[in-house]
Every structure is written in structure tokens, then in C-alpha cells.
């Protein structure tokens, strides 16, 4: 099998790639794709070493709707639990000649390492706190649908920046298109090392002033060691209607899910464009699978 292109990080994409994927995703949303079974007779293996509802279901539905044969391996009963090395497992699966492997793993950077041992297309469905490129592509599509362009938009990413792969991928992608990016987080959850970020804030109301887009992040308790008060977090960093009034009147509020209601966001604004993100995520993953098979 010829070596095909991977999607491991946002840096794998050019502006042209993003625009082409976005165009394809819009065609899938509008049901205007001429050959919707572009993956007929292709084999897609889903390997999710972390729990997932949205991303796993989205990739599985996307691949099946494009005509692929999809195998989602039950990790808890796989050879990994018998002590097999992850690299050996990937090499074994690669020997079966799949066309794609879609992998989620708790270890940052691991998928870049695994890519050296496969000759199929490899897609990163989230690796630790490193990257989640298809989520960023879906978020880009949502923002474009509301704001038409990214350049000079004030986009505020708020919450658990330190542990967030969604934040990292969005920062890198949105900056490619000229966004002005601000981060809001408690000091213990802030990450100060992004050259692409324009400003850091420790106050939510200060950070979202005149924001065009507010992107909230889940508080990732599974990656944290302390037990900070959820009530205190919501008081300081949870978004409600009163705090939202500091943003622009037409600001959109996003969240990659799953939502912790009453922690990151109040019930009265929790249903903003979040389900649209899910819908656009499915179209985006169809577009990515379609695009990678042709490059």
C-alpha cells in the first residue's frame, strides 16, 4: 500500500488544505457531494485508548456513511491488556493493510511516534494535552458560518488551558487565519508558552470584553491532581448571562463537550452553538477522510 498522508497536528495543514477541507465539509452539510461513497472497500480502524462519545461516534458514522468497512477495537479486551507493547500492536494492525487508523491516546505526542510504524493514513483523534486537529477544523467551520472570516476576530479561549488539546489545536489553526487570541484561566490552569497568543487574563469579565467568539473548555479533572472547588471555579470562570454581557452582543459561545453544566457554563446559555459544533464535526470528519484519500 502506498504511504498516504496523515493528520497528526495542525502544522500538517497548509491554509489551502484547511480551505479545501472546509469546502468539502460544507458540501457534506449541504448534501452536494457527487460521490458520497469515496471510501467504498476501504478499511478504517478506530483505536480509542481514552473514553469518547462524540469523537468516536462521529468518526465511525463519517467513515460508514462514506462506504468504508469500519472496525472499532474494544481496547479493554485487546492484546494491550495482555501486556503487548503499543508499538507492536500498531505494527500488527498495519500488517493487515488498513487504509486508515484513527487513534486517541492519553499520552501527548505518542501518535507522532506511531506514525513511523504504519503505511496507512493516520488521524489523531486526540493525544493527551497535545492536539485534536479535527475538533479545531470543526470549530473553524462553525466560526466561519457565523462570522464569515477569522481575520481580526477576538477569540477568547477560557478554562483549563493547561490540559487542553482542543485549545492547542485551535490556537494554531485560528492564528493561521489572523485571529486575535486571548486566553482566560486560573493561574494554575494557564499556559504561557504560546507565541500565537495576543493576551493572557486571569479575570473572565476582563478577558471576554468585546469578544467575538468565546470558546469554553471542560475542566479536565482526570488530568488534574488537586480538588479545587467547582463552586468557586464557576463563580470566577464559569460563563453565565451576566458575564456574557461583557462580550459583543453578537458573540458566539462554543464548547467542545462534554459540558459540565454549572461549572464551565450556566444552563441558560449552555445550548448556544454546541450542537452545531457536533453536526459540523461529523461533516468535517467526512471531509478529512475524503481529503486524505486523495492527496
UniProtKB/Swiss-Prot annotation:
Carbamoyl phosphate binds at residues 54-55, 104, 132, 135, 257-258. SUPFAM superfamilies: Aspartate/ornithine carbamoyltransferase (SSF53671). It is an enzyme of class 2 (transferase). L-aspartate binds at residues 82, 165, 218. PROSITE patterns: CARBAMOYLTRANSFERASE. GO terms for biological process: 'de novo' pyrimidine nucleobase biosynthetic process; 'de novo' UMP biosynthetic process; amino acid metabolic process. It catalyses: carbamoyl phosphate + L-aspartate = N-carbamoyl-L-aspartate + phosphate + H(+). Keywords: Pyrimidine biosynthesis, Transferase. Gene3D superfamilies: Aspartate/ornithine carbamoyltransferase (3.40.50.1370). Pfam families: OTCace, OTCace_N. One of its GO terms (molecular function) is amino acid binding. Belongs to the aspartate/ornithine carbamoyltransferase superfamily. ATCase family. Catalyzes the condensation of carbamoyl phosphate and aspartate to form carbamoyl aspartate and inorganic phosphate, the committed step in the de novo pyrimidine nucleotide biosynthesis pathway. Heterododecamer (2C3:3R2) of six catalytic PyrB chains organized as two trimers (C3), and six regulatory PyrI chains organized as three dimers (R2). This is Aspartate carbamoyltransferase catalytic subunit. It comes from Wolbachia pipientis subsp. Culex pipiens (strain wPip). The lineage of its organism: Bacteria, Pseudomonadati, Pseudomonadota, Alphaproteobacteria, Rickettsiales. The gene is pyrB.
Amino acid at each position: 500500500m502506498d504511504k498516504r498522508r496523515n493528520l497528526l497536528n495542525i502544522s500538517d495543514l497548509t491554509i489551502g488544505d484547511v480551505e479545501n477541507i472546509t469546502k468539502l465539509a460544507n458540501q457534506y452539510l449541504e448534501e452536494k457531494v457527487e460521490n458520497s461513497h469515496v471510501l467504498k472497500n476501504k478499511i478504517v480502524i478506530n483505536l480509542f485508548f481514552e473514553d469518547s462519545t462524540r469523537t468516536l461516534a462521529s468518526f465511525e458514522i463519517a467513515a460508514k456513511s462514506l462506504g468504508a468497512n469500519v472496525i472499532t477495537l474494544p481496547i479493554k479486551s485487546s492484546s494491550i491488556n495482555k501486556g503487548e507493547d503499543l508499538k507492536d500492536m500498531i505494527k500488527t494492525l498495519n500488517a493487515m493493510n488498513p487504509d486508515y487508523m484513527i487513534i486517541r491516546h492519553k499520552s501527548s505526542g505518542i501518535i507522532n511516534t506511531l506514525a513511523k510504524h504504519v503505511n496507512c493514513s493516520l488521524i489523531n483523534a486526540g493525544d493527551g494535552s497535545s492536539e485534536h486537529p479535527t475538533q479545531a477544523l470543526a470549530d473553524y467551520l462553525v466560526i466561519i458560518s457565523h462570522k464569515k472570516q477569522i481575520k481580526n476576530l477576538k477569540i477568547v479561549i477560557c478554562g483549563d488551558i493547561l490540559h487542553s488539546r482542543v485549545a492547542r489545536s485551535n490556537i494554531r489553526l485560528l492564528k493561521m487565519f489572523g485571529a486575535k487570541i486571548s486566553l482566560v484561566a486560573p493561574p494554575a490552569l494557564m499556559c504561557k508558552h504560546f507565541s500565537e497568543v495576543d493576551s493572557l487574563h486571569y479575570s473572565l469579565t476582563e478577558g471576554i470584553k468585546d469578544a467575538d467568539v468565546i470558546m469554553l473548555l471542560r475542566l479536565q479533572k482526570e488530568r488534574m491532581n488537586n480538588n479545587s472547588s467547582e463552586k468557586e471555579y464557576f463563580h470566577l470562570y464559569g460563563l453565565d448571562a451576566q458575564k456574557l454581557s461583557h462580550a459583543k452582543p453578537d458573540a458566539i459561545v462554543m464548547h467542545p463537550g462534554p459540558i459540565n453544566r454549572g461549572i464551565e457554563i450556566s444552563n441558560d446559555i449552555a445550548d448556544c452553538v454546541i450542537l452545531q459544533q457536533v453536526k459540523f464535526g461529523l461533516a468535517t470528519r467526512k471531509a478529512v477522510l475524503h481529503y486524505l484519500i486523495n492527496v
